[in-house]
Amino acid sequence: MKDLLQQLTSHYRLTKEEAKEAMLAIGNGKINAAQVAAFISVYMMRSITVAELQGFREALLEMCLDADLSEYDPIDIVGTGGDGKDTFNISTLSCFVVAGAGIKVAKHGNYAVSSSCGSSNVVEYLGYKFSNSKDVLRKQIEEANFCMLHAPLFHPALKNVAPVRKELGMRTIYNMLGPLVNPALPTYHLLGTFNMDLARLYGYIHQSLNSKFAIVHALDGYDEISLTGGFKVISNQLDRVLEPDDMGLHTYKAAELSGGKTVEDAAKIFIEVLENKSTRAQKEVVLANAGLAISIAKPDISLFDAIATARESLESGQAYECFKKAVK
């Protein structure tokens, strides 16, 4: 690893195979914490290549527990995190709205590293029980149209980098990798990125995998559709910038999307959205993301119709019913 680190500090780009071997070595605990921190830091100072990202992804999937749920044709809705925006849990709420519309969801998530409350924090606080049992996950996705794969339970290799990530307290290559290494192997993907370069990288990765996907990046930095302005969409069908009114929705201020300072704050907003008692801004930003997700899983309907489907799921209480079944 010393030699590799020396090469990396001299602007060397890893091949796919070298990247995979490096990630396997880290995951298997063969690299000390100082070297892990140095390795991670390289990618905080320069952009990652497609080959490196592919190699890292392959290594993490090779080391993860089997949880293949592809027979259910599920979707994952996930952002990289690390955008520094501290929004409420938009992607996770969108999952339940999509589930309420009859689409299976296999959500890959984790505790917060660089924000106040991650997807795992809020669903656990509200009563969801994490499991890495395939039988439990099958039961959940069959009964609630939703299951959550809490990353540390499926990626034991991550335990070797968790302390370093926590100490760094900022986005790292692992933020980039999280959305790419869902052990459920979902059929459909809605991925949010914190910058445009990563959106393009994700696009290349998913095109090479023949995935059914959409990647979003809000032009003002959010890793999801924020309705605070324009946002880029890269998908099997689209590669363009959309505005909120292209979806029949309104534009909002960043402050209207705040997730609060604590898990309790985030959980309060979460339930208010599911009970259809939230602010219009909170409701519409969830509908925007859920609507785009529905349009990926149902490409034969328009984006407007997909948003209408999302609205029906939320306003009818079906989204909340899926949540209650998931946490029972």
Swiss-Prot record:
InterPro entries listed in its UniProt record: Anthranilate_Pribosyl_Tfrase (IPR005940), Glycosyl_Trfase_fam3 (IPR000312), Glycosyl_Trfase_fam3_N_dom (IPR017459), Glycosyl_Trfase_fam3_N_dom_sf (IPR036320), Nuc_phospho_transferase (IPR035902)
Binding positions (5-phospho-alpha-D-ribose 1-diphosphate): 79, 82-83, 87, 89-92, 107-115, 119
Keyword Magnesium: yes
Gene Ontology cellular component annotations, sorted alphabetically: cytosol
One Pfam family recorded for the sequence: Glycos_trans_3N
A single MF term (Gene Ontology): magnesium ion binding
Source organism, top-level taxon: Bacteria
Keywords: Amino-acid biosynthesis, Aromatic amino acid biosynthesis, Glycosyltransferase, Magnesium, Metal-binding, Transferase, Tryptophan biosynthesis
Cofactor(s), by name: Mg(2+)
Family: Belongs to the anthranilate phosphoribosyltransferase family.
Protein name per its UniProtKB record: Anthranilate phosphoribosyltransferase
Provenance organism: Cytophaga hutchinsonii (strain ATCC 33406 / DSM 1761 / CIP 103989 / NBRC 15051 / NCIMB 9469 / D465)
Gene assigned in the entry: trpD
